[in-house]
């Protein structure tokens, strides 16, 4: 896989707008329960951060369940090249990182896993652009604020943003209006009202 193929993969599989659910440290049973809850609400993108052996088990189980129903599961918090291999072995569809590491991007592409590196500055956006990447995670989005996205879209109109970190169902629309393509949330999936609001982003007429 090269950067162009990675960009095409994201364009084909990420909606406009879209929502991604992040399930960190829940263990296998609870992660599966929450993933099914998200999928039932129409949220097809799920990220399982891999920071412990139990996280890897949760990723593998969720990826297997998602594969059977056409849902995409990412390995998140990928901070080493070894994580990339672990993600591939456990069936991850793509890889999400908190920061931008050129060696991890290269490892992902070599493994056939679309990379979604994290950025928070114009310099990092320019590096990602130089690598041929068009899709990035912006973290921590709530700290940066929605205006960050509207301002940075000016010099980087070709970039596609996945806003992550501190977002809620209430704040998500502001970020989408600022040019974000995908909003990523965590505990909001456990709240009925927030889940309904997030589902409404995907089906505004419902």
Per-region residue spans from a language model:
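Glycine-rich beta-to-alpha transition loops that act as phosphate-gripper elements at the mouths
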Residues: 24-27, 75-81, 97-101, 117-122, ...
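Conserved functional loop/turn residues at catalytic and ligand-binding sites
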Residues: 42, 91, 99, 112, ...
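Glycine-rich phosphate-binding active-site loops on the catalytic face of alpha/beta enzymes
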Residues: 94-107, 137-148, 178-201
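Conserved N-terminal beta1-alpha1 strand-loop-helix module at the mouth
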Residues: 1-93, 110-111, 168-170, 177, ...
């Amino acid at each position: 896989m090269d950067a162009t193929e990675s960009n095409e993969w994201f364009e084909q599989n990420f909606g406009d707008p879209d929502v991604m659910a992040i399930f960190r440290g829940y263990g296998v049973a609870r992660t599966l329960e929450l993933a099914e809850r998200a999928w039932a609400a129409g949220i097809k993108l799920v990220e399982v951060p891999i920071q412990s052996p139990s996280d890897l088990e949760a990723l593998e189980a969720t990826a297997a369940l998602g594969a059977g129903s056409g849902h995409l599961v990412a390995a998140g918090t990928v901070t080493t090249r070894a994580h990339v291999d672990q993600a591939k072995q456990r069936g991850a569809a793509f890889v999400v990182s908190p920061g931008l590491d050129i060696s991890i991007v290269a490892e992902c592409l070599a493994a056939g896993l679309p990379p979604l590196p994290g950025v928070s500055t114009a310099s990092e956006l320019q590096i990602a652009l130089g690598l041929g990447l068009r899709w990035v995670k912006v973290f921590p989005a709530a700290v940066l604020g929605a205006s960050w996205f509207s301002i940075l879209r000016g010099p980087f109109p070709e970039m596609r943003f996945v806003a992550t970190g501190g977002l809620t169902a209430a704040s998500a629309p502001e970020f989408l209006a600022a040019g974000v393509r995908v909003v990523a949330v965590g505990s909001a999936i456990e709240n009925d009202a927030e889940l309904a609001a997030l589902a409404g982003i995907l089906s505004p007429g419902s």
